[in-house]
Amino acid sequence: MEFLVQKIGMSRTIDANSTPVTLLKVLQAKVCQLENGKALVAYAMHKKYNKAIEGQQKKYQLSKEFNHFATLKASQQKELGDLDLSALETLKRVKASFKTKGRGFAGVMKRWNFQGGPAAHGSRFHRRPGSIGNREWPGRVQKGRKMAGHYGNELVTCQNEVLSFDKESMVLVLKGSVAGFSGAYGRIRAV
């Protein structure tokens, strides 16, 4: 089973051994279509919608707030309507997939933890990457060379232990951290 979640943020448990935890809000979703163990679901995200979304809402008899669609693995879901959240109460471990924080175009020191050059004593080699190849052979830059470039905004999946799930407020508490900023949307699935 897969579920759509929004990251609330991080906190910690208040006991003898303080444990860092991540709080995730499980999004309410409506199952519109079931096919081969996969479900097309609609969920609420932002207020924006257009004529194409309006047509989908009319087709599946959805209210205006359900304006985004996603395909989830839903092997236990048998009928259309609200997505069944009963599986979350018994989960022990989940795989959480989120996009990392985007850092734009970053240099080699930030992106790859290069040491950099001397800061003073007449040096003019501070944050540069340095040499990127050999000599006449191979006469080109090797594939996979660590260089400056776009950093972050990549999909990252990690396994976390489930500490608790509050059905009323639909908040899932995971041990440890997950990628992304507070407020980021992602997915969780049972391991």
Curated annotation (Swiss-Prot):
It comes from the Bacteria. Residues 119-138 are annotated as: Disordered. It holds the Pfam family Ribosomal_L3. One of its GO terms (cellular component) is cytosolic large ribosomal subunit. One of its GO terms (biological process) is translation. InterPro entries: Ribosomal_uL3, Ribosomal_uL3_bac/org-type, Transl_B-barrel_sf. GO terms for molecular function: rRNA binding; structural constituent of ribosome. Keywords: Ribonucleoprotein, Ribosomal protein, RNA-binding, rRNA-binding. The keyword tRNA-binding does not apply. NCBIfam families: L3_bact. One of the primary rRNA binding proteins, it binds directly near the 3'-end of the 23S rRNA, where it nucleates assembly of the 50S subunit. Belongs to the universal ribosomal protein uL3 family. Part of the 50S ribosomal subunit. Forms a cluster with proteins L14 and L19. PANTHER family: 50S RIBOSOMAL PROTEIN L3, LARGE RIBOSOMAL SUBUNIT PROTEIN UL3C. This is Large ribosomal subunit protein uL3. It comes from Helicobacter pylori (strain J99 / ATCC 700824) (Campylobacter pylori J99). The gene is rplC.
